[in-house]
Amino acid sequence: GLDLKACFQYLDLLRRLMRRGTSVVLVTHHIHEIPPEVTRVVLLKKGRVVADGKKEDVMTGETLSALFGTRIHLVRSNGYYQALPGRKQV
């Protein structure tokens, strides 16, 4: 993992490349590293595609909970996503 400063520099570089029209294939387990400019997301589990489509359609708490096998509460802010522990149903 990168420290926060290095992570922000990395994201800034990715965003600049994408704004210039460069295609970027990003492979990560860290959803907070997905830049706002990303339009398509492919989710894999054990080498198989479990979801593929527009970022806003694929990046849901329900989809990520199924993918990672744990409840996830997904938060979106300024085009970025963050996974938080999901709440148990009462």
Regions found by a protein language model. Name each.
Residues 8-20:
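Helical segment within the ABC ATPase nucleotide-binding domain
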Residues 34-36:
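A short, surface-exposed alpha-helical micro-motif characterized by mixed small hydrophobic
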Residues 4-6:
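Helix N-cap at the start of a conserved alpha-helix in ABC-type nucleotide-binding domains
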